[in-house]
Amino acid sequence: MDTPLRRSRRLGGLRPECPESLTSVSRTRRALVELESNPEETREPGSPPSVQRAGLGSPERPPKTSPGSPRLQQGSGLESPQGQPEPGAGSPQRQQDLHLESPQRQPEYSPESPRCQPKPSEEVPKCSQDQGVLASELAQSKEELTPGAPQHQLPPVPGSPEPYPGQQAPGPEPSQPLLELTPRAPGSPRGQHEPSKPPPAGETVTGGFGAKKRKGSSSLAPASKKLNKEELPVIPKGKPKSGRVWKDRSKKRFSQMLQDKPLRTSWQRKMKERQERKLAKDFARHLEEEKERRRQEKKQRRAENLKRRLENERKAEVVQVIRNPAKLKRAKKKQLRSIEKRDTLALLQKQPPQRPAAKI
């Protein structure tokens, strides 16, 4: 088993980027397994071993690699054409320093120029420690989808001082945002999307989905309300406080029952009803008074009629004045009943003196 110390000896004294990554033995082991499983490696005769094994032999793993660094781009997959390590000034040590300590991002390419150019004499790129075997398998599956994608380039040999077309002169640059890790076909512009992913629907698709959602929401609204009503759990009522489980819960005290209040009437209607009641009372009193008046009139008329009849009878009667009291003594009881005492002075004054007739 190769340890980070032994591997650093064999690589010829490469300087690690960060001492914290020396403990990641498992990740370096994965990178070695990936390298051994790749039979397409070829070495260039003129390049020193340190340059050829620059991407593999570094035992360090940066804790947080910038999104645009070639290490992250190498770990993205075998077919990833996004980043290339820049060629050095001419010495192997300079190339090692550029590859290990100063990772640089690649410049923005025009849509006409491919992302990177393949080189038949170069070896297949290695998987970095940060991605591992899972990232390599994912990259291989994506590479099968796009067979025409160019391979990642390694640093050129020290004898070639000229950079490749599309590359930038070495120098520290700020890291760019994370780029797409899926392969691109050569000649495909930067703005195009991958073939493995479906193209975005755009406004038309989103609008259509929103329209479908709006149409479906109106139809599902009553159904959702019904479901909510049906889903409400039936909570059983507990034992009454009094302990009477047979107690009828519908029965309540009269004070607890809700009583309907009488309908409120307007002020005008109240005054109208009061006036009507007053008129009814007045009319009833008037009727009683009228009835009493008629009764009194009838009584008075009756009395007057009786008095007038008596007077008429007296006027029409024939009387005999008894001037001899001895006759009264000899008269019988039956005769005495018909005899009356009356005041005859008024009659004598009104009428001329007549000869009185004796009653038999």
From Swiss-Prot:
This is Coiled-coil domain-containing protein 86. Citrullinated by PADI4. The modification Phosphothreonine is found at residue 65. Residues 1-314, 328-360 are annotated as: Disordered. The keyword Nucleus applies. Pfam families: Cgr1. The modification Phosphoserine is found at residues 21, 24, 47, 50, 58, 66, 69, 80, 91, 102, 110, 113, 128, 188, 217-218. Residues 1-12, 238-254 have a biased composition (Basic residues). InterPro entries: CCDC86, Cgr1-like. It comes from the Eukaryota. The modification Citrulline is found at residue 342. It is found in: Nucleus; Chromosome; Nucleus, Nucleolus. Residues 273-295, 302-314 have a biased composition (Basic and acidic residues). Residues 153-164 have a biased composition (Pro residues). Residues 66-83 have a biased composition (Polar residues). Required for proper chromosome segregation during mitosis and error-free mitotic progression. Keywords: Chromosome, Citrullination, Coiled coil, Nucleus, Phosphoprotein. Signal peptide: none annotated. Residues 272-323 form a coiled coil. GO terms for cellular component: nucleolus.
